Amino acid sequence: MRCLQVFIIFLLLIPSPPSVDAQRKTKDDVPLASFHDNAKRTLKRLWNKRSCCPREFLCCLR
């Protein structure tokens, strides 16, 4: 059973062939930078909610 787990981990480590992202960009493609900015903004907002003080409940509502 342990060999099966090791085998699955090795399969996950094998590099995969180029995906759809490797295709040429068209004029309709949205740059990934906007997605990364949105993700960073969301994570920052969630982090601020997590680190706010219980006495200052209003900081959690932003």
From Swiss-Prot:
UniProt key word Disulfide bond: yes
InterPro entries documented for this protein: T-conotoxin (IPR031565)
Keyword Amino-acid biosynthesis: no
Record-level GO cellular component terms: extracellular region
Pfam short name (any one): Chi-conotoxin
Tissue specificity field: Expressed by the venom duct.
GO MF terms held by the record: toxin activity
Propeptide residues, chain positions: 23-48
Signal peptide: 1-22
Homology family: Belongs to the conotoxin T superfamily.
Domain note: The cysteine framework is V (CC-CC).
Designated name of the protein: Conotoxin Lt5.5
Organism: Conus litteratus
